[in-house]
Amino acid sequence: MKRILLLSLPVAMMVACSNPSNGTKTETTPPASTATASAPAAANIDGNLLGTNHWLLDNAVDASGKRIDALFVRADKPVTLDFKDGRLSVSNTCNHLGGSYTLEGNALTVGPMMSTQRACGEPGVMELDRLAGDRLQGKLTVRSLDAAGLSVATASGDVLTFRGEPTPETRYGGTGERVFMEVDAQTKPCSHPLIKDYQCLQVREVKYDDKGLEQGKRGAYENFYGNIEGYNHEPGVRNVLRLNRFQIKNPPADAPSVAYVLDMVVSSELVKK
């Protein structure tokens, strides 16, 4: 049997204590008299609502109202927050960041953050780890929260505004099935009813037990006609992926009945032609 160590982000485990909310839009209290609290703060934070979306950074200003441009060096990949299973994780920085958090009233308090350790060559991206981490650690005041957006204020007066995008679990109405799939280094031409000269990923399923031991022998590669959400194939690199597979309710006649969403890349191997 071949053993593959399943990698995971070294983020701190945590327990989220949330207060119930009677609606999807959080009620607000009158604004404080300080300059940094010009908008009302949320009276209670709906912890369940936090977990239904990915939260993509849409705007960030300092206490004087000046845009914090350094947080937007990756215009096509905004800094993103995810609240899931008692964890806050931060992605689209250089490294993945994560830390524990608690909810009380209108306060979202984030503990010290841990991160993966990798270098990034893009200008300004390495600095994102510090810029985002410093602003998200400590006590944040939630100014507003609904399905469309989240706005928080830091102790120093910075205001970060995020737009909400539903998670796959929210979009597909349930928890996906965990599967592992090996994607070969090169695509191959395949016959597609709608797309001329289509190139298919070459995939095969990989099975592990709960200890990470591979079970059985891998079969032959097969054409994969769909897309894997969140996965960008790099020719010449063979990957083992951990995926969530969702059943699509009432798909159109010419559309797939299942959706695959990338959870993590388990292993990668550079393959020479």
Name each model-derived stretch:
Residues 13-16:
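C-terminal motif of bacterial Sec signal peptides marking the signal peptidase cleavage site
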Residues 18-234, 238-273:
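Lipid interaction determinants
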Residues 1-4:
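Positively charged n-region of N-terminal signal peptides that target proteins for export
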